[in-house]
Amino acid sequence: MKMAKSANEIGFITCLVVFLVLTGQSNGMSNGMPRTVPCIEGRILWNRTLPCSSILCGDHCVPHGYRAGTCDIVNDRAICKCSRCR
């Protein structure tokens, strides 16, 4: 009887460990390192019909690892291009 009880406890602990490992990976437990998009010179951050300015574009480019951004109007669309990788 004692042997069966300890075998059940080992099985329960094994299942618990497997469950924690699987749920930890699916919930992003491995997100310790941030995923960064490689810095590509001239990357288009957004392309939209709203008006834009180079200041607004630059404010959006800085958190993505760039030093500046420029706003160009092409075919009545505002295109924000990031430049000067950090």
From Swiss-Prot:
Keyword Disulfide bond attached: yes
GO CC terms in record: extracellular region
Location(s), subcellular: Secreted
GO biological-process terms attached to the record: defense response to fungus; killing of cells of another organism
Keywords: Antimicrobial, Disulfide bond, Fungicide, Plant defense, Secreted, Signal
Signal peptide: 1-28
Keyword NAD attached: no
Family: Belongs to the DEFL family.
The name this protein goes by in its record: Putative defensin-like protein 189
Organism from which the protein derives: Arabidopsis thaliana (Mouse-ear cress)
